Amino acid sequence: MKDFLKKELYSLRAVTAILARWLLLAVPTGLVCGAVGTAFHLAVEHVTEWRGEHVWLLWLLPLAGLAIVALYKLTGCEGMGTNNVIRAVHSGESVSPLLVPAIFLGTVLTHLCGGSAGREGAALQMGGSIGYNIAKLFRFSDHDRRTATACGMAAFFSALFGTPLAATLFGIMVEDVGLAFSVAFVPGFAAALIAYGVSLACGIAPTHFGLTAPALSIDTALLAAVLGAACALVSRGFCWLLHTMEHEMPRRLPNPWVRAVVGGAAVVALSYLMGVGRYNGAGMGVITAAIEQGQALPWDFLCKMLLTALTLSAGFKGGEVVPSFYIGATFGCVFGPLLGLPAGFSAAVGLISVFCGATNTLIPSILLAYELFGGAGLELIALGCGVCYMLSGTHGFYSSQLFVTEKLLSEYTASWEERLRHH
């Protein structure tokens, strides 16, 4: 009995020390990500308002592209993106601290001059870089820096959207599809809550949509499933277009300076052809109108797809997540009523489903629905989201994601089995 108590006491001390170490990491990560995330949110918000008041700024997009190319060359961050941060979680690959100012300024310039991009891709890169480098500063091991990278991603996502639980699960599940990097949950959630608290203290309201949902029934469940299946096609199409253009643009225009100017000019021309302002920037106003007012144009999702793919493939910065919200919400708003579902509710199903299909993150997407919509229609949204997840295949934004299990089969993938053998 005495030996048993000694072992238990030793074990308790050990796990307490480990927990304290993770909290030591979570506090500065949450504070720094909260502060930088708040500054980033305010910067993007202000330049978006300024661009709306000064439409002529759109004509400066090619010049902004040149500035971004110069900025990335100056900081040595050429070619770095969200995939690098995900690889850091997989293997402990280093993440440059200069990625933070590079993606911060690059995204602000993109939004100032009307590029069609989001914020969350930038948030994942900045958060991952901050978490990794704080762990490096504290002399954490290479393996523990992987956890720190995931914590930073969760904290920055939380600061921007005000969804700490979804942000945490996203940060620990986006790397390996079908597996949760569970050791990062407690420090990641602590960092996310701290970052969320910092953003609230600075006056940043969490993202929330008012949503009226139909009653749960066999009919509405079937319709939500059909809508989810349609969203899987949209998700596949968006990811295919992104990857195709990101491959073709550098092949056809290998000079990054020329690519930025030509791509920027093309975005300007298409913006005037499609409607200045509607497809530029993140488009949160259009998303809100689709969900809360049931208003969207039939071609909105296609126009946003094209402009976002063109913007990002030309070298502008931001991300794909908020554009996926836009595409899903506007598609759902238009397609859902054809099935007999309310337009606003269909927009909510579309937003979550396309996001889920494009990021391959089922559980975080369902939690995001809860935090964005306050639980309204959660069962139906989760059903549509689940169907979209299963039918979206291995298509996704992030080529560095590893698929631990097949989406439609109860077995590990060959790539995961190979990875286990290497360890």
Question: Predicted regions span which residues?
Answer:
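Alpha-helical transmembrane segments and immediately membrane-proximal extracytoplasmic
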Residues: 1-423
